[in-house]
């Protein structure tokens, strides 16, 4: 039996086990997926433990950048952004990948995104994946909004290296008229209004955050304004299916829409 897991902290809630275990059952694969609460001080210990105990694992907040420094090898995309959300155990050799960017890229392309200006909220591991996805979809310019300006400047360095025209914008500053807004933070309900969505002329909003039984306030506000939305559940499902392919090889996977429908059906709002 294959055992896979998700590491993060504090990992208060996650839909990942429901997604992966549904796929395993649907495909009649002898495997299980479990959440594993791992604090930063125990991360190195977990990495060594996983070599014998797990066939692979996913990584979430706050470990995506740290894990990239601790495992044996990174594929080209993960190495470019130094952020890992999926680890494959290949005969005790831990190889890191990033499927977050795959999920973002797929969802943007499906909505007809063609590289228009973007506003990115956040500068952590998830934001690094967004920058890579935007570069692959032909994005020309992005602005980065983050509480820590230093981290935003660092992220812009990565973006510039990928050929994007990147600038940092302060909270309450000039956000411009971004075609797409992407939230790559666990933005709280008290903060979403800082964006003044109604004044930005945004056509598409992608929120990587999600809640188990309801939409985030950012998604709700965007819907009220008639803005097309991509929610965090869709991103979670798409990155999970990409991770399963890395772990299990090519298989006749269920569609993202099928899995999204299942997950939202068992977690009604």
Curated annotation (Swiss-Prot):
CDD domains to which the protein is assigned, alphabetical: NAD_bind_Shikimate_DH (cd01065)
Gene Ontology BP annotations: amino acid biosynthetic process; aromatic amino acid family biosynthetic process; chorismate biosynthetic process; shikimate metabolic process
Protein residues bound to NADP(+): 76, 122-126, 208, 232
Active site (catalytic residues): 64
Enzyme class: oxidoreductase
UniProt catalytic activity: shikimate + NADP(+) = 3-dehydroshikimate + NADPH + H(+)
Complex formation: Homodimer.
Family: Belongs to the shikimate dehydrogenase family.
Name of this chain's protein: Shikimate dehydrogenase (NADP(+))
Organism from which the protein derives: Caldivirga maquilingensis (strain ATCC 700844 / DSM 13496 / JCM 10307 / IC-167)
């Amino acid at each position: 039996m294959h055992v896979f897991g998700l590491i993060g902290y504090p990992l208060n809630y996650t839909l990942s086990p429901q997604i992966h275990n549904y796929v395993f059952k649907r495909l009649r694969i002898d495997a299980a997926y479990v959440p594993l609460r791992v604090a930063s001080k125990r991360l190195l210990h977990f990495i060594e433990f996983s070599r014998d105990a797990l066939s692979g694992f996913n990584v979430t907040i706050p470990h995506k950048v740290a894990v990239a420094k601790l495992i044996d090898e990174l594929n080209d995309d993960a190495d470019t952004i130094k952020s890992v959300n999926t680890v494959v155990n290949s005969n005790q050799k831990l190889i890191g990948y990033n499927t977050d960017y795959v999920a973002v890229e797929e969802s943007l392309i499906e909505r007809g995104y063609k590289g228009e200006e973007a506003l990115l909220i956040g500068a952590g591991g998830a934001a690094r994946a967004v920058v890579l996805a935007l570069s692959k979809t032909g994005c020309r310019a992005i602005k980065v909004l983050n509480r820590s300006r230093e981290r935003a400047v660092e992220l812009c360095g990565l973006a510039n290296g990928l050929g994007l025209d990147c600038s940092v914008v302060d909270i309450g500053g000039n956000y411009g008229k971004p075609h797409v807004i992407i939230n790559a933070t666990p933005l709280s309900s008290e903060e979403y209004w800082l964006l003044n969505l109604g004044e930005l002329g945004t056509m598409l909003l992608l929120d990587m955050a999600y809640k188990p039984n309801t939409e985030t306030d950012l998604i709700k506000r965007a819907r009220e304004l008639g803005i097309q939305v991509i929610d965090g559940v869709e991103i979670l499902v798409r990155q999970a299916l990409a991770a399963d392919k890395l772990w299990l090889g090519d298989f006749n996977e269920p569609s993202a829409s099928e899995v999204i429908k299942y997950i939202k059906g068992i977690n009604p709002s």
